């Protein structure tokens, strides 16, 4: 991150500490009930309590209640106008990211925080949550935005100045940080320094691949294209650990109780919505939409309907739009 003015930096630091605290609470929720090291999940916040507390909204309900942009906000010939006329928001992302964007095999619907946000943006522009997913990886996200294959990328996409040279970012809309995933039986790795001398999996072209060189320079790094390949390397014993954004790793641990997330996040990973480069009107529009759903509580409702169904605690503080270098 580049240096920022003291006032802005202080605000961001406070918000980051809140986000780290919330992330720590989420990680603790996955492991707190297992005295022998195994993980167990808290009960879903969507269930009624003994006192008759009403069930939380579902993702579909949150999206259905989301706002629609006024006609005056969509100018003729703009990025938004083209999407509205087409009737579908074409999204780059994944269908295998637990808690963020994962396809439900029973319904064939995409579920998760990123998936829900893309549906809410589609509704804001079009009036209905019509999206079309094209699968992307860390290697193809910029290219797909540059060649017009997708309108936007929702993919736990960390904002960096280097990436911002190729694409624009709206946001940040969520803050995470690099963390460590290991087998639940592993009690020797708890912090980045413990990775030195170990074999560590991560995604190629990810910020984590660069972070490992800084925080664990003696680690042997195995690079893979996708999250699932990194998880398999750990479960099969080819890697001792897997380093990536904590939000993604928590989802992996939810899916596979033989895994656990250890320690605290040791970097800042602000997620942004990838947009075509040099379209300030599109970026301003999406930033304004994010501010709207932050302020009216729709962002928090979506968090509760997605991530909050798997982990305990309140939604984290919303990031400051434009606070990340590159946003």
For the regions a language model picked out, list residue spans one by one.
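C-terminal motif of bacterial Sec signal peptides marking the signal peptidase cleavage site
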Residues: 28-32
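Bacterial signal peptide processing site
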Residues: 34-37
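Extracytoplasmic small-molecule ligand-binding "clamshell" domains
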Residues: 46-48, 52-57, 62-153
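Extended ligand-binding regions for polar small-molecule ligands
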Residues: 51-74, 186, 206, 273-311
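Acidic, polar ligand-binding/catalytic clefts
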Residues: 131-193
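Short helix-initiation/N-cap motifs at beta->coil->alpha
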Residues: 131-143, 187-188, 204, 222-232, ...
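A ligand-binding cleft/hinge motif common to bilobed small-molecule-binding domains
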Residues: 156-165, 213-214, 235-268
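Periplasmic-binding protein-like
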Residues: 174-182, 250-290, 310-327
């Amino acid at each position: 991150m580049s240096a920022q003015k003291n006032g802005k930096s202080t605000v961001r630091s406070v918000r980051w500490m809140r986000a780290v605290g919330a992330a720590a609470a989420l990680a603790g929720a996955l492991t707190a009930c297992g005295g022998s090291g195994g993980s167990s999940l808290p009960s879903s916040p969507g269930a009624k309590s003994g006192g008759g507390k009403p069930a939380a909204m579902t993702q579909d309900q949150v999206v259905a209640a989301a706002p629609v942009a006024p006609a005056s906000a969509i100018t003729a010939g703009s990025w938004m106008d083209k999407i509205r006329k087409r009737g579908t928001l074409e999204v780059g992302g994944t269908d295998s990211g637990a808690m963020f964007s994962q396809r439900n095999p029973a319904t064939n619907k995409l579920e998760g925080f990123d998936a829900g946000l893309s549906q809410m943006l589609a509704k804001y522009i079009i009036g209905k949550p019509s999206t079309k997913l094209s699968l992307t990886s860390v290697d193809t996200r910029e290219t797909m935005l540059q060649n017009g294959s997708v309108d936007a990328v929702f993919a736990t996409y960390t904002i960096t100045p280097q990436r911002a040279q190729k694409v624009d970012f709206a946001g940040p809309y969520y803050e995470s940080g690099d963390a460590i995933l290991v087998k639940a039986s592993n009690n020797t790795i708890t912090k980045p320094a413990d990775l030195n001398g170990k074999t560590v999996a991560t995604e190629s072209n990810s910020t984590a691949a660069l972070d490992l060189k800084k925080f664990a320079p003696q680690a042997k790094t195995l690079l893979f294209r996708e999250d699932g390949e990194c998880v398999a390397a750990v479960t099969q014993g080819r890697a001792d650990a897997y380093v990536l954004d904590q939000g993604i790793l928590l989802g992996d641990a939810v899916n596979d109780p033989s895994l656990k997330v250890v320690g605290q996040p040791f970097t800042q990973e602000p997620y942004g919505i990838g947009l075509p480069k040099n379209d300030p009107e599109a970026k301003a529009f999406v930033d304004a939409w994010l501010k709207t759903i932050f302020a009216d509580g729709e962002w928090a409702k979506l968090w509760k309907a997605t991530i909050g169904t798997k982990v305990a605690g309140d939604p984290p503080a919303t990031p400051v739009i434009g606070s990340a270098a590159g946003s």
